């Protein structure tokens, strides 16, 4: 997409640069990450006066107290915190950084594109396994952890994209993920939903995953390929292919790449098992089943009696 250069007024640019540099330096230091996140959020939400009043022991309302406590990610839980197989060491830091990302997106500053893109790029450099240069991360992006995500150079991830890195996500150079796209790297057993299987999901260089499309766990979207709007990818999209529908099927090769692309029939190959990520849960880990379902199938006699009674 052809863009024009836009810049902030010099005074605004100076303020943005100073703030991002300060947060970056603090996150790169030996300072406690949880404390840094809390401190930054207190100021971003303009709550410094109320926070200092509370910290000094002066009375505050119950609503004010719970709001001020919420700036500290140690006082909050997020969904992925409950996942049994997560890497506890990696998650401890990524939770704090993910909290800062999410809460930043709830501030008015998140709509200042020049400021917000640079702030999120800086956060990604601390949160992701690896992130390239000149990426553009827009508002409302969500992750499972963040620390299992690799993103290449000049990649654009638009509003409300979900990046499930419960397994592993690799997103290449110059990739475009359109609004509301979903990339998954985990799946559930069809009978026992609590049994989780993790995979490596790949979106290769120059690929485009368009509006509201879904790439399921263990799939690969090939180089220079396009996934159509609302498509569901349940296998591999070969390089240079255009895939649409549910499940997504290759319907065309991008003009100009016909001589180097695989035939359309090659699309949809399921190589999920090659990308499985094995894990083991600690034997002493206390777990629970949130559904409490009974997985015992009915006996033949029970099924027969039900049929006869209808």
Say what each PLM segment does:
Residues 1-126, 251, 256-310:
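Terminal amphipathic alpha-helical/low-complexity segments used for targeting or macromolecular assembly
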């Amino acid at each position: 997409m052809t863009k024009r250069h836009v810049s902030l007024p010099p005074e605004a640019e100076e303020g943005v640069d100073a703030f991002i540099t300060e947060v970056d330096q603090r996150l790169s230091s030996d300072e406690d990450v949880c404390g840094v996140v809390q401190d930054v959020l207190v100021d971003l939400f303009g709550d410094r006066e109320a926070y200092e009043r509370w910290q000094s022991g002066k009375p505050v309302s119950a609503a004010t107290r719970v709001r001020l406590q919420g700036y500290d990610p140690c006082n909050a839980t997020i969904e992925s915190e409950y996942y049994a197989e997560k890497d506890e060491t990696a998650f401890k830091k990524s939770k704090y950084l993910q909290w800062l990302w999410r809460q930043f997106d709830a501030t008015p500053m998140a709509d200042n594109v020049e400021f917000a893109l640079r702030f999120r790029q800086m956060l990604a450099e601390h949160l992701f396994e690896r992130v390239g240069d000149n990426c553009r991360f827009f508002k409302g992006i969500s992750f499972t952890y963040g620390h299992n995500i690799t993103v290449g150079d000049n990649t654009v991830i638009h509003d409300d994209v979900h990046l499930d890195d419960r397994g592993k996500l690799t997103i290449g150079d110059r990739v475009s993920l359109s609004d509301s796209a979903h990339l998954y790297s985990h799946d559930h057993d069809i009978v026992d939903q609590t049994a989780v299987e993790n995979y490596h999901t790949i979106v290769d260089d120059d690929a485009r995953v368009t509006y509201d499309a879904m790439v399921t766990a263990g799939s690969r979207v090939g180089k220079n390929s396009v996934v159509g709007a609302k498509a569901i990818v349940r296998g591999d999209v070969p390089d240079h292919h255009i895939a649409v529908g549910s499940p997504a099927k290759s319907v065309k090769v991008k003009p100009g790449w016909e001589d180097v692309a695989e035939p359309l029939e090659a699309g949809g190959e399921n190589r999920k098992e090659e990308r499985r990520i094995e894990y083991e849960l600690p034997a002493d880990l206390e777990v629970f089943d949130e559904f409490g379902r009974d997985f015992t199938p009915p006996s033949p006699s029970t099924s027969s009696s039900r049929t006869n009674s209808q």
